[in-house]
Amino acid sequence: MTKYVFVTGGVVSSLGKGIAAASLGAILESRGIKVTHLKLDPYINVDPGTMSPFQHGEVFVTEDGAETDLDLGHYERFTSARMGKRNNFTTGQIYESVIKKERRGEYLGKTVQVIPHITDEIKQYIKRGAEGAEVAIVEIGGTVGDIESLPFLEAIRQMGIEEGRNSTCFIHLTLIPYIPTAGELKTKPTQHSVKELREIGIQPDILLCRADRPVPADERRKIALFCNVMPEAVIECLDANSIYKIPGQLHDQMLDEIVCHKLNILARAADLSVWENLLRALENPKHTVDIAFVGKYVDLTESYKSLIEAVSHAGMHTESKVKIHYIDSEDIERDGCAVLEKMDAVLVPGGFGKRGTEGKIAAIRFARENKVPYLGICLGMQLAVIEFARNVVGLAGAHSTEFERDTPYPVIGLITEWQDRSGKLEKRTEASDLGGTMRLGAQVCHLVENSLAREVYGVADIVERHRHRYEVNNTLLARLEEKGLRVSGRAPGTDLCEMIELPDHPWFVGCQFHPEFTSNPRKGHPLFTAYVKAALARKAAATSA
């Protein structure tokens, strides 16, 4: 029978519940326990797929095509568990499901209410997402005290009773702020946060205290006394310069032991040697490399969370410190590409909308003409095709129909139909809804023999995750190929262009998919590792010249 760890947050948002939950999952997994994760988001959107990156940050895409919260990316990177549609749900999904049941008459004429109907639906979703795991770590989004979170908190309160004391554990992440004028840490916000949680009917078993400096033992004893938890269950979460230090930090304070004792689980000792080896590589780099990250959401780097982590993983596996330079593409439109001259490589990530695209195209042209290693992901590949069409093939005004409906050369256009991995035919038009209508999830890509892509991956067929509704226009592709563009990856059966490269360039690759979603610190990802190696080679050549 599955046991549950519920993770809530208090005082302020963005304390790192996702990292804490993922770290606990990593430690429990190292003890031989099969874990899974769930994220419950209290917003009314059905999913984050149509939300602005400035509002929500990155949208993480799972293998089965769910557009989910970025915390699911942390869960996959920290553990071997694969997330899916059942691992993230929102208030919007819950209400949609309940309303559909009411319309079908499943409630037999009863008055449909938050309690019990909404809370019962939440519990059903939690149990469904936890199937097959020994321990399900369930993170409740938002902050205790938010109106939006109340149905979720009531649902997990009920589960605490229904599942039994030895099958549930409640962890509350809170903030211990340091007040410079007083010269001390303050515990009162934590006391009030726990008080609010207890008023709802939830008594936390463990407190994770986020702080920027060590919490003295007497302060921890005070927190334990006034929050009604055992002193050893007051655990400090200190700021760290790498999220991959957190599993060790929590294990050193016996978090996993306390959780296993609470859930009555007998498990082997934790083995965190993999994490220790990764940290050694991270903290003792032999090389340094500078990468220009040209996008339009660079003021909020959470928008590129998985991509940043994937580049970091490549650094670990090449013994390199990767310095990412975030460059707003609109700045390049205004000031030119001089900022790229000292970079060892250029990366253009995915995105939506016309704003900033000309700056990205200028950066791509700089990388192509100056033989700077280039990696274009999703929109970054599409813009590389547009740049090549304009400046090499001579198709003036070439563009994507996403940005210029009447472009004379629509080298990028809407995908009107394709098959998903199950063989189901998907169709789209310009009139289709925005939400949930993209080509999503894991898709097979066949790599051309003797291509750079084939060399990098080392296999003929790969599976990567997609999130896009526009693709390279095959009707114009032949003219680009005549001038040297090479299509190195295609989707079997549909002929969709998945990867492009330039054979006369040291390292120039574009991919329609998002390889960052499958990178993890233990193995890295071959595409990012090869990209960083190319950047290192360019730097070495420039240094010796």
UniProtKB/Swiss-Prot annotation:
One GO molecular-function entry: glutaminase activity
Positions of the Glutamine amidotransferase type-1 domain: 290-541
Residues holding CTP: S13, D146, I147, E148, K186, T187, K188, P189, T190, Q191, K222
Alphabetical list of PROSITE patterns matching this protein: GATASE_TYPE_1
Catalytic activities: UTP + L-glutamine + ATP + H2O = CTP + L-glutamate + ADP + phosphate + 2 H(+); L-glutamine + H2O = L-glutamate + NH4(+); UTP + NH4(+) + ATP = CTP + ADP + phosphate + 2 H(+)
Location of the region described as Amidoligase domain in the Swiss-Prot/TrEMBL record: 1-265
Residue sites binding UTP per the record: S13, K186, T187, K188, P189, T190, Q191, K222
One GO BP: pyrimidine nucleobase biosynthetic process
Stored Pfam families: CTP_synth_N, GATase
Domain of life: Bacteria
Regulation (activators, inhibitors): Allosterically activated by GTP, when glutamine is the substrate; GTP has no effect on the reaction when ammonia is the substrate. The allosteric effector GTP functions by stabilizing the protein conformation that binds the tetrahedral intermediate(s) formed during glutamine hydrolysis. Inhibited by the product CTP, via allosteric rather than competitive inhibition.
Gene Ontology cellular-component annotations: cytosol
Pathways involved: Pyrimidine metabolism; CTP biosynthesis via de novo pathway; CTP from UDP: step 2/2
InterPro entries membership: Class_I_gatase-like (IPR029062), CTP_synthase (IPR004468), CTP_synthase_N (IPR017456), GATASE (IPR017926), GATase1_CTP_Synthase (IPR033828), P-loop_NTPase (IPR027417)
Keywords noted in UniProt: ATP-binding, Glutamine amidotransferase, Ligase, Magnesium, Metal-binding, Nucleotide-binding, Pyrimidine biosynthesis
Binding residue positions for Mg(2+): D71, E139
UniProt-listed Enzyme Commission number(s): 6.3.4.2
Entry keyword annotation includes DNA-binding: no
Active site: C378 (nucleophile), H514, E516
Residues annotated as binding L-glutamine: G351, L379, G380, M381, Q382, E402, R469
Family: Belongs to the CTP synthase family.
Described function: Catalyzes the ATP-dependent amination of UTP to CTP with either L-glutamine or ammonia as the source of nitrogen. Regulates intracellular CTP levels through interactions with the four ribonucleotide triphosphates.
Note: CTPSs have evolved a hybrid strategy for distinguishing between UTP and CTP. The overlapping regions of the product feedback inhibitory and substrate sites recognize a common feature in both compounds, the triphosphate moiety. To differentiate isosteric substrate and product pyrimidine rings, an additional pocket far from the expected kinase/ligase catalytic site, specifically recognizes the cytosine and ribose portions of the product inhibitor.
Entry protein name: CTP synthase
Organism: Aromatoleum aromaticum (strain DSM 19018 / LMG 30748 / EbN1) (Azoarcus sp. (strain EbN1))
Lineage: Bacteria, Pseudomonadati, Pseudomonadota, Betaproteobacteria, Rhodocyclales
